[in-house]
Amino acid sequence: NLVQFSNMIQCANHGSRPSLAYADYGCYCSAGGSGTPVDELDRCCKTHDDCYARATKSYSCTPYWTLYSWQCIEKTPTCDSKTGCQRFVCDCDATAAKCFAKAPYNKENYNIDPKKRCQ
């Protein structure tokens, strides 16, 4: 779920940036999403959105509210859930959190005007 995803982000980036810094970034790191991702970090968010869409389609679940089991092992989010929607959503979140940790954060892409930048 969103709280677990936030905690995974903190695990992967070692607490270097608050999770909310990603909540209104680029074209895809917020509710909805459209157009071309503005950079590598925004591509991480688009991939995460696409992963959640696959979870919804494949498992008829609601990824934003799905609880799963995971651990932060050596600063790496690691999924414990074994099957179905829980595992799929956990993998989506863990992959995105690791992607966020590797991608540069460009302050000019925070809180952009999607009507101008997300065509």
From Swiss-Prot:
Entry GO MF terms: calcium ion binding; calcium-dependent phospholipase A2 activity; phospholipid binding
Region (Important for membrane-damaging activities in eukaryotes and bacteria): 107-117
Ranges in coiled-coil conformation: none
A GO cellular component annotation in the UniProt record: extracellular region
Keyword Secreted tagged: yes
Cited PROSITE patterns: PA2_ASP, PA2_HIS
Principal location: secreted
Pfam families assigned: Phospholip_A2_1 (PF00068)
Cysteines paired by S-S bonds: 11-72, 27-118, 29-45, 44-99, 51-92, 61-85, 79-90
A biological process from GO: arachidonate secretion
Subcellular location: Secreted
Domain of life from the UniProt record: Eukaryota
Keyword vocabulary terms for this entry: Disulfide bond, Secreted
SUPFAM superfamilies in the cross-refs: Phospholipase A2, PLA2
Tissue: Expressed by the venom gland.
Stated family: Belongs to the phospholipase A2 family. Group I subfamily. D49 sub-subfamily.
Protein name: Basic phospholipase A2 homolog 1
Native source species: Notechis scutatus scutatus
